[in-house]
Amino acid sequence: VGYEKLEHPVQRRILAEVERWTGVAAADLGLGVDGCTAVSVALPLRAMALAYARFGVSGDPSAVRLRAAVAAHPVMIAGEGRLCTDLLVATGGTAFAKLGADGVYCAMLPQAGLGLALKVEDGDMRSLTPALVALLRAIGDRVPLGFDPARLPESVSAACRAGDGEYARGRDGLASLGGASAVFGLALRRPAPGDNQEGT
């Protein structure tokens, strides 16, 4: 049995870790197969945000080691010019965000004890970066984050790409087809009774 199969011990360990950080019982996890043939887990946004919040403040040696590795090598997370890397660099490794598939972005803000999870309903990946930056700025206006979200780029690239991944070209060379920005309101709620778990 290959390691990517659900019954392999590696996948069982992964599911146990997902349960540990999200608080969702392994039996209740939605399971599928991703583009790499490995098991993929479906979670509610709240569970994703909770996992990132818990991981961001955990003193568990493995969490500390992983956070230190990410802070030391931010380019390995996504690459130059990508928000996942830019956020790590701009915050000295204290804040971390990771792009997911189908319009998902999650972030941990350890100095504020927060985790974030975004999902663009139609799976549009282009709108995620401006949405996350706008959300960080809105939260930063209300809660100290340990960094200045106003210094983050609104969009990593304002140029729209054609369907084949190449930039659209006009007579005068590279042409920008427009940009993206987020427009929404943010209402923070006070934790309800029972929400006061570590990292919520």
Predicted segments, located by residue:
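Active-site-proximal helix/loop microenvironment
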Residues: 1-61
